[in-house]
Amino acid sequence: MARSTPCSQTSLAVPNHFSLVSHVTVPSEGVMPSPLSLCRCLPRELSPSVDSRSCSIPLVAPRRAGKLFLGTTPPRAPGLPRRLAWFSIDWEQVCLMHRLGSGGFGSVYKATYHGVPVAIKQVNKCTKDLRASQRSFWAELNIARLRHDNIVRVVAASTRTPEDSNSLGTIIMEFGGNVTLHQVIYGATRSPEPLSCREQLSLGKCLKYSLDVVNGLLFLHSQSILHLDLKPANILISEQDVCKISDFGCSQKLQDLRCRQASPHHIGGTYTHQAPEILKGEIATPKADIYSFGITLWQMTTREVPYSGEPQYVQYAVVAYNLRPSLAGAVFTASLTGKTLQNIIQSCWEARALQRPGAELLQRDLKALADSIEPM
């Protein structure tokens, strides 16, 4: 079967099921179970485990000129039920370019889908904790069908995998950019053009990026979604210099958290950015993301790492002794603007979640501060 869109070969080693996608065979039965139990808070039609067929979750459909549009239904393949046709990724249109990164979760590739640049995440089965891998895969789809300028959009996702692969599934996402906020802060970048990051992250730029992130959080929280792993490494910067929140593998829906109040479970994330209530095993709220944002804003402002020392000691000190990164630097004390920024950061990482501002109030304060300084 020939590809309808030719793909140039790459010298990088990539999985066979992508480089030879026209020869992929997928299991005809079976689907990865959802880690979420069915309850009154989770309707049956939203549970991925209800249908026994392998499924995908396409969120946009191709139209003219290979562009992707939201909310339209693609033509149904002959002989396929309506739902199964809607749940089909056009694998022949997947064309890998190169790998962007890899880790315990799997690998992310830059690619094109129907001629449009995308990022493709291949989620691996974790032999030590398969349940955690499954939970992470489905959590990535919490933003299914959502669209916002400051959120990396999911294009499609599928539990269909080659029979010989170690993959739980595939997620096709909007290509958010080559550079993360972490790379901009600390100087390392994968951008094809050299970037002297240490000279370019001005206070005005920090506030601009901060507003991008807060706008994304405000939208997520309005949809009752918590990110729960917000940090510079999970914020992409597009070619248009717009920050986009990515990596929703730890995200939660508020209604699902309410379902689990009687049986708390471990919430993933990065210990340096986790709120005290999360470290104590309490139920998460949107204010946990605000805490993480406060640490992230401190990193942007100081260009330093939050903590040093063993993780378990840091976690204990954050909860027991209210340990936080230092706000004593000149960037916070030498000017009225710095002192205002200091107050904003301090309010974000208050020990009690109720004392932290919501995303809407934070957006207002950051915009007022950004308007008070000279243009970038």
UniProtKB/Swiss-Prot annotation:
Recorded superkingdom: Viruses
Q: What is its EC number?
A: 2.7.11.1
Q: Does tRNA processing appear among the keywords?
A: no
The top EC class, named as a word, is: transferase
InterPro entries the record matches: Kinase-like_dom_sf (IPR011009), Prot_kinase_dom (IPR000719), Protein_kinase_ATP_BS (IPR017441), Ser/Thr_kinase_AS (IPR008271), Ser/Thr_Kinases-Pseudokinases (IPR051681)
GO MF, one annotated term: ATP binding
The UniProt entry annotates the active site at D229
The family assignment reads: Belongs to the protein kinase superfamily. Ser/Thr protein kinase family.
Its protein name is Serine/threonine-protein kinase-transforming protein mos
**Species name:** Moloney murine sarcoma virus (strain m1)
The gene is V-MOS
